[in-house]
Amino acid sequence: MSITKDQILEAFAAMSVMEVVELIEAMEEKFGVSAAAAVVAGGAADAGAAAEEQTEFTVMLTAHGDNKVAVIKAIRGATGLGLKEAKAMSEAAPVAVKEGVSKEEAEALKKELVEAGATVEIK
């Protein structure tokens, strides 16, 4: 007996957000792929043209480190989240702390989180 697409969708609908994140990570590992959106090159672009400089960045918390309280405070300050939400975000690493920010803002947030003891990436 095979599972139908509808049954898979129903199983997804019954999962919590954390369970879906864990499932996606397991699928990425098993199939050797990334869930990040693929960038499609424009057909009219010249092959020798330089890549357009990125203007929006995402600050990713990859680990909260040993000083979890300081990291939670930094997340709260940067995002305006409540204590419970900031704690959940720090525990869900890797997670996007802020998306669509300027390079300067991303660098400043990264510095703040690293000083608090977190491991951070800018994408």
UniProtKB/Swiss-Prot annotation:
<comment type="similarity">
    <text>Belongs to the bacterial ribosomal protein bL12 family.</text>
</comment>
<dbReference type="InterPro" id="IPR008932">
    <property type="entry name" value="Ribosomal_bL12_oligo"/>
</dbReference>
<dbReference type="GO" id="GO:0022625">
    <property type="term" value="C:cytosolic large ribosomal subunit"/>
</dbReference>
<dbReference type="GO" id="GO:0006412">
    <property type="term" value="P:translation"/>
</dbReference>
<dbReference type="InterPro" id="IPR036235">
    <property type="entry name" value="Ribosomal_bL12_oligo_N_sf"/>
</dbReference>
<dbReference type="InterPro" id="IPR000206">
    <property type="entry name" value="Ribosomal_bL12"/>
</dbReference>
<comment type="function">
    <text>Forms part of the ribosomal stalk which helps the ribosome interact with GTP-bound translation factors. Is thus essential for accurate translation.</text>
</comment>
<dbReference type="GO" id="GO:0003735">
    <property type="term" value="F:structural constituent of ribosome"/>
</dbReference>
<protein>
    <recommendedName>
        <fullName>Large ribosomal subunit protein bL12</fullName>
    </recommendedName>
</protein>
<dbReference type="Pfam" id="PF00542">
    <property type="entry name" value="Ribosomal_L12"/>
</dbReference>
<keyword id="KW-0689">Ribosomal protein</keyword>
<dbReference type="Pfam" id="PF16320">
    <property type="entry name" value="Ribosomal_L12_N"/>
</dbReference>
<dbReference type="InterPro" id="IPR014719">
    <property type="entry name" value="Ribosomal_bL12_C/ClpS-like"/>
</dbReference>
<dbReference type="InterPro" id="IPR013823">
    <property type="entry name" value="Ribosomal_bL12_C"/>
</dbReference>
<comment type="subunit">
    <text>Homodimer. Part of the ribosomal stalk of the 50S ribosomal subunit. Forms a multimeric L10(L12)X complex, where L10 forms an elongated spine to which 2 to 4 L12 dimers bind in a sequential fashion. Binds GTP-bound translation factors.</text>
</comment>
<dbReference type="GO" id="GO:0003729">
    <property type="term" value="F:mRNA binding"/>
</dbReference>
<keyword id="KW-0687">Ribonucleoprotein</keyword>
